[in-house]
């Protein structure tokens, strides 16, 4: 057990690490140490979910309780993937991404519980275990110890391939609603062929959920402004931010293209999500995502947005995914309080491989919107290790000279990472930017390359088969 003790001493919570491993046979290698840590963490997640099941009366909100139960299920799913990694020949970066997601799930649940005054020792315990396991895997990743190269292949639509089902409101397709088509696909394993749902032109007033067991689903429409999915759930109408989304993608390998997703609750109803994605290795291509506060919830996983339009006001690109927005147009609308914040990234552990990268895009006011008197910022830190980088992007006059704004969190100003690299436009000047320790005007090209697709979301292993165009360099 001496070897395990030494490894535990290098984790953020050594005492809990040693307690976790104390009943295990002697640890003889770093690989075995990681495997034991992940397995014990998985056991803890199963127990925490069971404990939370019996906490329903304390929640006082069935919606919040169901949200936590769902997040525990997703956490168990990600930890299972990590446990099976050696058998499936995946990479350390895969494991780090899945552990980052598990920790994000727990944080989302914790936030709901804190608002309701509910406490859970098992939630606190499993959070510490995931934090420790993240640190262990990060150390091994830095030392170059790999399980192998990912062999998961995402089979996808290319020109001329057959669409599986068609959705049409007039009855000319296989289904009249999108959710019926998703349900008709059934459970689909990772690595299964892409299941393609074509949604014909129309306004679909429904809430769509592509669940965690629905992997490799593609939903393709007839174009932005033609195939429209719309809803109006919001915080102001009694829904949590997490549950307010018009469209939810949870199954891995999701692809959405040529569709519009809207939340029409309006700025007076506060948080109102149009799209929430928890889908690892997900892609959105030529989509319009429209709302006001909290429009695009990049909750967790590795995500890529290409040639998308995103509309909003306050924190309208937010969450803790590893998300890259490339060749996108980001439109600020009129906010209710005179302040727009484009991003609110919520990385809260330095070992999480998460952040928001805006690359080769355009940030400007929405068409027809007058932003006189409105202050617009590139972002604010939702959590202490928030990470947002803007690269090669056109920033219009709406961006305030100081660029970024605080969230009443003085500590975060030194631990966050906000970066700008070779942007253009009247709002791109950095001479009057914030003087925080965590803000960087990036001058080193090697530092900037850390936020390219291959480095930041491990794109080489999964993005090319989607047939979506992308740029791998700066």
UniProtKB/Swiss-Prot annotation:
Catalyzed chemical reaction(s): [(1->4)-alpha-D-galacturonosyl methyl ester](n) + n H2O = [(1->4)-alpha-D-galacturonosyl](n) + n methanol + n H(+)
Binding site for substrate: 241, 271, 380, 382
CDD domains reported for this sequence: PMEI-like_3
EC number, UniProt record: 3.1.1.11
GO BP annotations, alphabetical order: cell wall modification; pectin catabolic process
Catalytic residues of the enzyme: 294, 315
One cellular component (GO) term of this entry: extracellular region
Region (Pectinesterase inhibitor 38): 1-130
Gene3D superfamilies for the chain: Invertase/pectin methylesterase inhibitor family protein (1.20.140.40), Single-stranded right-handed beta-helix, Pectin lyase-like (2.160.20.10)
Presence of the UniProt keyword Cell wall biogenesis/degradation in the record: yes
Disulfide bonds: 308-328
Region (Pectinesterase 38): 164-461
Record's subcellular location: Secreted, Cell wall
Keyword terms, alphabetized: Aspartyl esterase, Cell wall, Cell wall biogenesis/degradation, Disulfide bond, Glycoprotein, Hydrolase, Secreted
Glycosylation sites: 80, 351, 409
Record GO terms (molecular function): enzyme inhibitor activity; pectinesterase activity
Tree of life domain: Eukaryota
Main subcellular location of this protein, as a coarse class: secreted
Feature type site, description Transition state stabilizer: 293
Record flagged with keyword Secreted: yes
Matches recorded under PANTHER family: PECTINESTERASE
Function according to Swiss-Prot or TrEMBL: Acts in the modification of cell walls via demethylesterification of cell wall pectin.
General remark: The PMEI region may act as an autoinhibitory domain and prevent untimely PME activity during transport.
Entry's family note: In the N-terminal section; belongs to the PMEI family. In the C-terminal section; belongs to the pectinesterase family.
Protein name according to UniProt: Putative pectinesterase/pectinesterase inhibitor 38
